[in-house]
Amino acid sequence: TFEPGCRNNWHIHHADKGGGQILVCTAGEGVYQEWGKEPQILHPGDVVYIKPGVKHYHGAAADSWFSHIAVECPGENCSNEWCEPVTDEQYNSAKIERF
């Protein structure tokens, strides 16, 4: 669970074969972004598959708690690489769409 505004650093899930990560969003509103792409707003019930080798981050929207189940997909020679923090500019580029 992430408190409002909390996010992890950019990171990469590496694997020689298989691997990756699945996020199952369970509560609140979250943000997911792949390096070089627009951020996505996440809502309960959303599922994100992150291919191995993709630099990304995820966390809570600025004004919402966010919970998800993170599943590390099985693979060979899997490892995580933690990178630089997500800047406020990168994080704040996410636009929240209310239902």
Named regions from a protein language model:
Residues 1, 22, 39, 47-49, ...:
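Conserved hydrophobic/aromatic beta-strand scaffold that supports enzyme active sites
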Residues 5, 42-63, 73:
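Conserved metal-binding segment of the jelly-roll/cupin
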Residues 12, 26, 34-36, 60, ...:
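Residue-level recognition of conserved beta-strand positions in structured domain cores
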Residues 57-99:
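Double-stranded beta-helix
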